[in-house]
Amino acid sequence: LYLFAGGHDHVGTVRDLFAISGSQPLLPRFALGNWWSRYHRYDEAEYLTLMDRFEAEGVPLSVAVVDMDWHLTDIDPGYGSGWTGYTWNRELFPDPAAFQAELHRRGLAVTLNVHPAEGVRAFEEAYEPMCRALGRAPSGSPIAFDVTDRAFMDAYFGVLHRGLEKLGTDFWWVDWQSGPYSRTAGMDPLWVLNQGHYDDSAARMERGLTFSRYAGPGSHRYPVGFSGDALITWRSLAFQPQFTAAGANIGYGWWSHDIGGHLDGFRDDVLATRWVQFGVFSPITRLHSSSSRFSGKEPWRFSQPGQRSMIEHLRLRHRMLPYLNAMNLHAHRDGRSLVEPVYYQDHSPQAYRYLDEYLFGSQLLVAPIVVPNDPVVARGHADVWLPSGRWTDIVTGRSYRGGRSHRMWRDLMSIPVLLRAGGFLPLVAEGESLDARELFPELEVLVAAGADGRFELDEETADDQWQTTVLELSATEGRLTITRPDRDRSGRVEWTLTLLGLASRSGARFE
């Protein structure tokens, strides 16, 4: 039993946890972009047509999720349910390898949904190879799922999943729903699956990745976490910001929520828009919905101005990739989650009461709007406590004094996203590539005036190394300095600096 008692030193306390349990690993950069996910019986043509539409709308995606209908689901009842499956439905996807290769060509990583509980049954293409691997005759009897059986688990990864990965699957959405029970007391199948899938992924890719439910303390070592299923209600949205920030207290920083909600609830374009705005400023941005014809989260399904707001925010998520990936390294190296409660920085009593807001990396404070619009003014509001100093909204350019609370009203085009005085927000330049895997030779950096500041922009290079560019603002001298590494491998040829919080906005261009 460990007891961590750090008083108000929340950061130090979590670092103590990491000292004995290991830190959060680095995510692949593509995981930080926009994910498309829907529980829907797609076929290949419909899925690729949908990807065409996202591209035509200028909405960048980096992960393509294919829910459980990729595999056979309408099976002989004598085998059990169609919930578990490992054989592609070739009526829907005639050539799985070509389908996934086309998604890869478009810059998308691919993840497939699996429910492992019913094991491997005789109708599966992998049944006989699994039997051979386990030294048993293919009698038609099911191969039981058993996390306590080392031989089964070796074949589970080395035969069952490896065969599918050879067709192009990058990582797995492990949708375990069958409880914490196994043949060995205390051995939770979810924990074994999370560790196993992450470690197996890390052996195949430069950085591991799985996508599964939280299995208890220590789960931060096996990102990403799946929090679904979310109800489509304001109450459900209102719960997610404080739930996400609180995850930092146990080092669990990489939550993926059902952005927009999954099921039940009601249709509300304002709710959907506010949810996407929160999703863009959450650890993982994964649009998701059920198979209902009325619940899809394609932005063009919604009325204006919500549609325009969703598209602009999803573009902003992609533009934030340089910042997000720097915070990815920050989380791994320095023991900080991307989303943290404001009381990590400000220990005043108010910081412990305003739980709908949070720190988003080292530079931003975000206050999602989680209530309906006031019908009189057609705006929603967030009650925000600001730590000391000055804070500037990156959309409106308005500055606020810290050390006090504010009620901030916004129309449907934005939520309060505040950059600390002396803060820096690096963004992909407008018009740059929509591919999250690529390097970005042009950056725009938002800089908030009002205080001295320093930001270390950690970036990956073409040879998969990290380099650091230091940005410094001297408010007293009116000087902004960019110190590039001695051997700059970023390929960057242009910077655009946009100053916020001045009497009038101004920009400077550096070649």
For each feature predicted by the language model, list its residue ranges.
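Catalytic-domain carbohydrate-binding cleft regions of carbohydrate-active enzymes
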Residues: 1-414, 420
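Accessory, solvent-exposed terminal regions and/or long lumenal/extracellular loops of proteins
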Residues: 414-510
